[in-house]
Structures are given as C-alpha cells and as structure tokens.
C-alpha cells in the first residue's frame, strides 16, 4: 500500500470529499427520478429553433442570390430580391449569434441539472453502495463528465440543423437542375459511411479515455490527502510515478481519439471539394447547353457545398458520443440504490434499548458481521472492541442505520430502524467519527447543523462537553471563525466532531473511534462530560484503548465478524485473547485487572465493576446471564 492510502498524516486541514459523511446527515427520501429543469428544455427548444431557422436562411440564400444576379444582369434592377438577399444574410448572422448565446446557457443549465441529479443519487444511497467509487472517480463524474453530458441537448439540436441544411440544399438543387442533384447524390453514401464509422470507433475510445482519466484523478486525490506522510517518508517520486502511471494509456487513447477525428475531417475534406467540383462541372455543361442561367450556376455551386457539408457533422457527432459516454457514467450515480425510510416514530421517552436480531452483513460475498440476539439496555455505555477488521465499524454503522444488514433487522426501543421516518431516526441517533467532515462554514454552523439545527447556547454547551470551547474562544472570531481559516490540529478537529454529535445527541449515540486523536487525559475529560453534560441515553463506543473499555458498563467483543463474548472489561481481561486485542498479551496476567495497559489516570472514574447489575442485562435475547468467554489461566 502506498503511503497515501492510509493517509495518517493528512490531518484535518486537508479536506476530503464529503462523499460519505455528508450522506449521513442528508435528508434521504424514497428514490424517485428527478425531472429535468424546465428552463433547460426551453433553452434546448430555442437552440433548435434558432439552428433550424439559420439552416433555412442558409438554404434560401443561394436561390435568392442567383435570382438577384440574373435580374441585375438582364434588367439592371433586381427589385425586392436584393433586399431579400441582404435580409437572408443578416438573418443568418443574427440567428447564428442567438444560437451561440442560447447554446452556452443551455449547456450550463443542463450541466447543473445532470450534476444535481447525480449528486442527489449519491447522497440518497447508503455508504456501502458508494464504496466501489473512489473519491477521485466521483469528482470526475460530477465535474468533467457532467459538463460533457450537459452539452448533449445543444449538440443534438445543432446536429439536427446541420442535417437539415444538406437535405434542404439537395432538394433545392433538384429544383434548380435534377442532373446536378444526381451528381451530388452519388457522393453522399460515402459521407454517410464515413460518419457511421467515426461514431462507432469513437465510442469505445471515449469510454476508455474517461475511465483512465478518473483513475488518475483518484490517485492524485489519494496523494494529496497523504501529502504530509509522503513528504515525511521521502516517497514523492514514487507517488508521482504511481499517480502518472496511467498517463501513457490516457495519452494513447487521446491520440487515437484525435486521430479518428482528424481522419474523419480529412476524408470529408477530400470528398466535399470533389463533390463541389463535380457539381460545378456538370452545372457548367448545363449552362453551355442553355439549360441554366448564370444565377442558377451560382446557386448550384453553393448548394453543392451545402449538400456536401454533411461531413462537418463529424465534430458534432463526436461531441454527442462523448456526451453519451459521460451521461452513462453520471447516470450510474443517479441510479444508485436509495435508502428508503418508513413512516413510524419512536415511542416517547424511550430509554434507547438497542437489539440486533439475526443481523448478517456481507461484502463481496464474504460475511463481515453476524450478530443475533444482542441487546443493549437503554442508558448503558457499551464498548465495542476487537482486532482490526473484526467488524467494529460495521456494527456501529448497522446500529444507527448508516447501512442496512443483508439479513435480520435492528430494533430501537422496539421499533425497527428501517420503518422509522428519516426525521425520527436522525433526531434520535447521533454519530461521531474518527475523521468528521465539518464543511466550509463557520465553527458554530458546523456544530449546529444536523437533522434539527441546534441553538447557539446548545452549541456552546456541546463544545464545552467535548473540550472544544477553550480553543474555539481563542480563535480570532470565536465560534464565527470560518473552518478553512481555523488552524485546527487533529485532536481539535475531532473534538468539534464530538461537539456536533453531543449537540444532537438523542437516545442513541454512536462514537466510531471518535476519540482516537485525543490524548488520554482529554479523552477522560470528554468521557466524564459525556456522562454528566450530554443528554442521557445509550452509548455505543468503538474502543481501542483499555481505559475506554474499562469505563464502559459492558464490552462487546468481536472476533472475525462475530460476537466472541459480552461482559465487563474486568471479566474479559481474564481471557488472553481479549488482552491481545489491546496488545497486552498473555504476560499481562489476569491479576493485572481492568486497568492493565490503560493510560495513566484513565481508571479514576471507571464504570461498574464485575458485580454491576448492568452486566446481567445484556448479551442474550432477553435478561439473563452474560455470555462470557471460557476462562484461560494467565501465564506468568
């Protein structure tokens, strides 16, 4: 793994894409298609009308100019044909200008619409559904691909007009002289085959180009997040090579794409003059035979150019092909499976009892969590411990319905989480994470934002409970300091995430490794404030330190995705496997007690001991004895 992958040195100052954490606070509703914005449709129609009108003016011009020339040569006065010709020229110029104006607005409007729908689809889904898409890939889809896809409506309108021009010119040419029209018609199949081949070959190349572009963007974002680690390790050149490794493939696809484009333009550039020359030659012969006038010959030459101009549609066709591939990529985000909420609410004044019934979570066909009959009493604090990959974060996500289990269900105060309304769930379940995403607003806004916006006083109380009030007040503008201008350390950033969770604490509060960047003394102070200053409720804490597990009422020990045992920290410490989770090993001995390996002072306000009544209320499908591991003799 590259140093960027873990990004331990990325720090809070390096903003991550809010792909996952924003979703946790987004008002997700039942999935339904988002209709296109009406202004985009109106602008598309305007582009089409202006393009078609310009094409009609272009087709009418040669006839008017030819008639004007004949009248001037014969009578010296063209009458109303001269101002008509001038009006057609001026009209085409104005219509082309209007087309350019409306095309720009149409592209911008549709790009915003595509980007909004893709982003909504991303925010509606559960985090595990977005996990296969790296942040760089998502960023590319929402920026470059959305812009390409947004240009499709205007490109289609322009393509339709570009086809009207040669078809109208061919009809007008047939009205002037059928023999010249037949001459031009013989060359059109070659142009049609040219466009068909260009569209077929370009599609695969554009798709490969966009995939490679997304891969480079993803690797670059990883490197930027881990820039501190890369600099400290001195692996900048290696990371540069890793990020740019796909560049050769990108260059090859880009050269191939432009080669196809150039080949199409080159071939059409040969065919168009040949057709024009042939039409002019036939027209000259017809003029010599007395079948055409000088004005008719002028019209014939111009109509031959317009008819053969179908080859100019290659660039528009290329834009449509790129837009089609880009739209396919943005539509993948738009159509992601949405989280559906129910209509029920929690019973009032519930204690926050949590039950996991027959829960199984699979990833890639592999079981990462199995929890059946696990009951957490309301108002208790339960530490979730286990080795890396044991399923701690998965259990924390399932407990508050950040993800839905593949089998089974979760109850909160007797109500299934998947049957709760979004407001009921997010009001009563709060989260704090290892790397909170706080946005770009002020500190007060970051802490206050949630399912319900917290008051200023509640924000301050939550900040004091999280140990953040002191350093926030020392900032130049206090709570009104914009986060991008706040020089926060990793621990301070994490404390603001805790403050946000405390400000919105309901009957269930889940701390997913949310104190990993705090020193042990600060962590202990936060734990005390959590018990005294935050709304009472059930706490589910993903713990990596023995001191945290010791202060909890109960410990839920996970191993290989399954519940190994449930009990107090002091009871489980008698098991060598449990001690090894904290790196204590068998040599620590059962007599080391709950505080073994804990940080200094962490046990000052430890939770209940082995005789606590809370121990008998957790572990099975109902009240009963705690499931404990088989005791192992401590080795000296």
Swiss-Prot record:
<protein>
    <recommendedName>
        <fullName>ABC transporter ATP-binding protein RamA</fullName>
    </recommendedName>
</protein>
<feature type="transmembrane region" description="Helical">
    <location>
        <begin position="78"/>
        <end position="98"/>
    </location>
</feature>
<feature type="compositionally biased region" description="Basic and acidic residues">
    <location>
        <begin position="627"/>
        <end position="636"/>
    </location>
</feature>
<feature type="compositionally biased region" description="Gly residues">
    <location>
        <begin position="589"/>
        <end position="606"/>
    </location>
</feature>
<keyword id="KW-0547">Nucleotide-binding</keyword>
<dbReference type="GO" id="GO:0034040">
    <property type="term" value="F:ATPase-coupled lipid transmembrane transporter activity"/>
</dbReference>
<keyword id="KW-1133">Transmembrane helix</keyword>
<feature type="domain" description="ABC transmembrane type-1">
    <location>
        <begin position="45"/>
        <end position="322"/>
    </location>
</feature>
<dbReference type="InterPro" id="IPR036640">
    <property type="entry name" value="ABC1_TM_sf"/>
</dbReference>
<dbReference type="GO" id="GO:0005524">
    <property type="term" value="F:ATP binding"/>
</dbReference>
<dbReference type="GO" id="GO:0140359">
    <property type="term" value="F:ABC-type transporter activity"/>
</dbReference>
<keyword id="KW-1003">Cell membrane</keyword>
<keyword id="KW-0472">Membrane</keyword>
<dbReference type="InterPro" id="IPR011527">
    <property type="entry name" value="ABC1_TM_dom"/>
</dbReference>
<keyword id="KW-0813">Transport</keyword>
<feature type="transmembrane region" description="Helical">
    <location>
        <begin position="269"/>
        <end position="289"/>
    </location>
</feature>
<feature type="compositionally biased region" description="Low complexity">
    <location>
        <begin position="607"/>
        <end position="618"/>
    </location>
</feature>
<dbReference type="GO" id="GO:0005886">
    <property type="term" value="C:plasma membrane"/>
</dbReference>
<dbReference type="InterPro" id="IPR027417">
    <property type="entry name" value="P-loop_NTPase"/>
</dbReference>
<dbReference type="InterPro" id="IPR039421">
    <property type="entry name" value="Type_1_exporter"/>
</dbReference>
<comment type="similarity">
    <text>Belongs to the ABC transporter superfamily.</text>
</comment>
<dbReference type="InterPro" id="IPR003439">
    <property type="entry name" value="ABC_transporter-like_ATP-bd"/>
</dbReference>
<feature type="transmembrane region" description="Helical">
    <location>
        <begin position="175"/>
        <end position="195"/>
    </location>
</feature>
<feature type="transmembrane region" description="Helical">
    <location>
        <begin position="45"/>
        <end position="65"/>
    </location>
</feature>
<keyword id="KW-0067">ATP-binding</keyword>
<feature type="region of interest" description="Disordered">
    <location>
        <begin position="589"/>
        <end position="636"/>
    </location>
</feature>
<dbReference type="InterPro" id="IPR003593">
    <property type="entry name" value="AAA+_ATPase"/>
</dbReference>
<keyword id="KW-0812">Transmembrane</keyword>
<comment type="function">
    <text>Probably involved in exporting SapB from the cell. Expression of the ram locus (ramA, ramB and ramR) induces rapid aerial mycelium formation in S.lividans.</text>
</comment>
<dbReference type="Pfam" id="PF00005">
    <property type="entry name" value="ABC_tran"/>
</dbReference>
<feature type="domain" description="ABC transporter">
    <location>
        <begin position="354"/>
        <end position="585"/>
    </location>
</feature>
<dbReference type="GO" id="GO:0016887">
    <property type="term" value="F:ATP hydrolysis activity"/>
</dbReference>
<dbReference type="Pfam" id="PF00664">
    <property type="entry name" value="ABC_membrane"/>
</dbReference>
<feature type="transmembrane region" description="Helical">
    <location>
        <begin position="297"/>
        <end position="317"/>
    </location>
</feature>
<dbReference type="GO" id="GO:0055085">
    <property type="term" value="P:transmembrane transport"/>
</dbReference>
<feature type="binding site">
    <location>
        <begin position="386"/>
        <end position="393"/>
    </location>
    <ligand>
        <name>ATP</name>
    </ligand>
</feature>
